[in-house]
Structure formats: C-alpha cells, structure tokens
Amino acid sequence: MDTLFRLVSLQAASEQQQQQQQSASYNSRSTTSSGSRSSSHQTNASYSYYHHSSNSGGGGGGGGGYYYGGQQPPPSQYYYLEPYQEECGNAPHHQLYMDEDFSSSSSSRHFHHGARVQQQQPPASSTPTGTAPTPPLSTSSTAAGAGHGLFEAADLSFPPDLNLDFSSPASSSGGGTASSGAVGGGGGGRWASQLLLECARSVAARDSQRVQQLMWMLNELASPYGDVEQKLASYFLQGLFARLTASGPRTLRTLAAASDRNTSFDSTRRTALRFQELSPWSSFGHVAANGAILESFLEVAAAASSETQRFHILDLSNTFCTQWPTLLEALATRSADETPHLSITTVVSAAPSAPTAAVQRVMREIGQRMEKFARLMGVPFRFRAVHHSGDLAELDLDALDLREGGATTALAVNCVNSLRGVVPGRARRRDAFAASLRRLDPRVVTVVEEEADLVASDPDASSATEEGGDTEAAFLKVFGEGLRFFSAYMDSLEESFPKTSNERLALERGAGRAIVDLVSCPASESMERRETAASWARRMRSAGFSPVAFSEDVADDVRSLLRRYREGWSMREAGTDDSAAGAGVFLAWKEQPLVWASAWRP
C-alpha cells in the first residue's frame, strides 16, 4: 500500500509491551488494506511531528499550528512522519519513473501494513523551535495518562455518518459545481471527493479527532499510482498534512528541488510533446492564440508600406516555446520579400524559493533550437529568454525594450497560464497588471487560462485582502473547487495516457505540487490561484481592452485539432449569460469547460 505517511510511536521502552498489545488489536481491525507494493525506495526530508497529548480534552480543542490558535502545545508525545515514498508496482524506479519526489536516504524506514511498529525515542531537537507549532491530534477516547503512541482501533473505525460508494469509477462530468461539491459531497463512486471534503471540513472546524480518523482512512486508500480517486486522495492528503503542520512552503520547496534535480531538456521535451500528442489541453490554446496573432500581424503587413515588417511577441507563458514552431511555419509560407522579422521575448516566471538552474538550462537549449528552426524556415528571427523570480506583477515591462528603439512595427502579448502568477490582493494587483499590458499598446493580447475559481474571495472587491484568503470559509471554497478541477484534469490524463508512462507521471506530479501550493500555502504566497473566464473578461474590459472574436478559419483549425484526439473533448463558445459573452472559446472535457482561450485589442 502506498502511503503518504507512516505513524511511528515515540514512547519509552518501558511501554513496549502495552504498544504491542494495542498494535495487535489494531491489526485485527485493519483488513481492508489493498496490500503493500513490491518495489519502493527510501526518501529524505525533514521529519515532521504530530503532537499528541493524552490530556488535551477533546478533538475540538488544540494548541498551535496553522489552524490551532498559534500557541505551542505542551511537549508530551510526538508521532514522526516519514516523507513521501516513491513506489511503482514491480517496475524498478530507476527504469520506469525517472524523477523522484525526494532524494534517497538511508535514514528513513518503510513499515509495511500489519508489521509491528518499532518504538523510538525522539531526538532532543525533535520539538519544533523557531517555526510554526504543529497541531495537536488529541483523541477524547484516550484516558489521561495512558500515554500510548498508536491509534486506538475504536478511534480508527469507519465513520458511521459517511456513506461511501466504491462501486463505480469516478467521472469528472458528474462532479457538479464547485459550490455544490464543497457543500454536498461527491456523486456516486467519488469516494475520494467525499472523504477529502469531509476531512477539509473537519480541518476548518478544528475537530482534531475527526481529522485524525479521516486522515488515517485516506492514508490507507490513497496511492499516487492507483486510479484517479487514489491519486486525488494521495495528493490532496499531502496538501492537507502540509497545511496542518504549517509546512506548506517548505514542502513545496522540497518538491520543486526534486523536480529541478531531475529536469533536463530531453525530459522536458518528451513530456511536452507527449502531452500535445495525447491531449489537446495545451495545444488548444496554442492554435487559438497563434491564429489570432498571425491574423493581427497580417493585417498590419497589408496596411503598411513595402518595407520589411518587424513583429515582436512578448511571451508570458510556461509552455517552453512549444507554441511557436507552427507560427514560424505559417510566416515561412509567405514570399521572401513579405517574410517579416520576428522577435520573441519569453518571460520565464518562478516562485522566489524555487530552483531555477534546470529551467535556465532548458531555456538555453530551446533558444538555440528555435533559432536553428527559424533559419531552416527562412524567417529572420531573434529569441530572448528573461528569467523572473516572484510575482509577475513585479516584472518591469518597460525594461524589456519591446519596441526595440522604435523599430517594432507591431507588438503582440501572449499570456498562456501566466496571469495567475500575479497574486490577487487588496491592491488589485491583477487589475494593475492588466492595465500595464494596455500601456504597452499591443496590437493583440491573447489570454489562455484554465477555468477554475480558486481565489478565496471576490478579486474585484475593495475588501479583498491577502489575509482574507486564509479563513475557514475561504479554505473550504477553494478546496472544493480545486478538487473539482484537478479531478477533471486527472481523469483526462487517465483516459489519454497509457497506464505506465514517465510523461504522465511527470504531469501528475506537477499537478501534485500545484495542489500542495493551493491547499497548504497562504493565499498571499500561492501561485495557483486560477480564476474563471468571467473574472478575466471583466478585468480585461476594465483595463481598456475589447474582445476579438476568433475568425472562422481559426475555429475550424481548433475543431480539426480536437478531431485528432479521443472522444470527450469539445469546443464551446462563451455563454451569453455572463460578462465573458463573446470573449473566447472553451476547451471542454466531458462537457465540463476546463481551458479558456481569448483574444483582446486596445
């Protein structure tokens, strides 16, 4: 059984006999485990500790931590938590799954389900100091002074108020809206959604006894190598635990460092190309945006004199330039006299704490290959990569010299899954960033964003603050919508990729990092706060832009693209019942809109 954490007793040796008796009782009740996997490797990370006080007085109380009042709990007992372990059926991890979540370590231990729990004394430095205190996981059923470090079998019994359905597989089309999912639970067969939402409610209510019970259940059922429900349980459970222990930013840095260590140009290229080959998730926005950019440039060329046109694209995206070869091919079909000079400035954004060495290596290789491809196509071309750390709103657009001293004939701004890199807050930073794009006076701005309402409050409200995103109500709203969105994403990967695939694993781990960011990091630090098309459309209109409808030729290109993929994908026009009416098109999976593409002009 894959597990996110293993709970290990930290009792004194004198209590060993009592622990073994309780462990035997626990094992007799734990007959529903799906079994242990035959291949695993150990991992390294800082061990976290659950505080357990036998005198705490109930599940609703509690001391410090992210939700528990900010007071340090009294030192009595701690459970240490083993870091995330990589397992992959019977395949060697170095053969099938290349990248790891953590590097190997000989200090971690793997305890199989049903084995006797090894007792250890915590080191002198085990009590957290200088960091946010960890939440107590107290149980009212534990007698004062009993002092055991294992869950009681009675405490871990199946909650009688939960009616879970394991009979049918998850379907992303049946999840309902974010609000209904967050309040009413999942549909038939969506056991992960039901358990995770109930666990999130318990976290928000500070019911530590029920949190402990539900986390144990999720831990037994979760696996990053199982079906969609097991993967959702695994990644969201990791995020919930990081939130409870106030270790979200640290966990995210560790995951990002592991990804950076195992990232190369070849692995990035394979993942991007395989994703485009099997799913239209990214290529949908590329085709729509390229069509709008090309048509706007050709309009400028037709109205200008015979002198050589110089076009410049400011590329604010995270797609590693996979969008641009088709645009270069389209420009190459023109006669030699009409072929314009094209410059692309790509801004590569990353969180302040994220490692960037691997991304810089990849972008250098991409730049060289882009320039070589442009020479083969006969298109005069210049490529520049700008690495930016932190909030995208802090990027100095004027310093990029996009007009090249006045030589640029037309400027286009391409925003693909990048606007969410501007952290929403009381200063209306996203509104201000849209206004800064308007000051560039571009010929066209293309916006491609994933369709999810992951901001904690109305981003346009004057009372919206960074702190407002960390209330219990805001957490539940974002958690429910995030569960809906990532459930649909995982479902599309499940039905598009083969069961064993390095590229699929890399994409799922990227989603896992996004889930940890969303669930465990403060709203003021999260880089995953997506918004809906209606919100982006209101913002673009307020900044002085007007929507540009995609031409019939571009729409035909998008439909032709979708016919290359399996059934379930479709294109939908923007509805007429909201402010996004007439602005862009949606990519839908099983009738659920997931990606929005649009074009705008000043």
Swiss-Prot record:
Keyword Iron: no
Record motif VHIID, residues: 311-315
InterPro entries: TF_GRAS (IPR005202)
Biological-process GO terms, alphabetical: asymmetric cell division; leaf development; negative regulation of mitotic cell cycle; radial pattern formation; regulation of DNA-templated transcription
Keywords carried by this UniProt record: Developmental protein, Nucleus, Transcription, Transcription regulation
Main location: nucleus
Highest taxon in the source lineage: Eukaryota
GO terms for MF: DNA-binding transcription factor activity; sequence-specific DNA binding
Ranges for region VHIID: 272-349
Pfam families in alphabetical order: GRAS
Start and end residues of each stretch annotated as Disordered: 12-69, 101-145, 165-185
Stretches the record annotates as Leucine repeat I (LRI): 190-253
SAW as annotated region, ranges: 520-601
A GO CC term attached to the entry: nucleus
Record field: compositional bias (Low complexity): 12-55, 122-145
Domain GRAS span(s) in chain numbering: 183-601
Start-end of Gly residues biased regions: 56-68, 173-185
Location relative to the cell: Nucleus
Region of interest: Leucine repeat II (LRII): 365-401
Tissue localization of expression: Expressed in leaves and roots. Detected in the stele, the endodermis and part of the cortex.
Subunit-level organization: Interacts with SCR1. Interacts with SMOS1.
Physiological role: Transcription factor required for the asymmetric cell division involved in radial pattern formation in roots. Essential for both cell division and cell specification.
Family: Belongs to the GRAS family.
The protein, known as: Protein SHORT-ROOT 1
Species, as recorded: Oryza sativa subsp. japonica
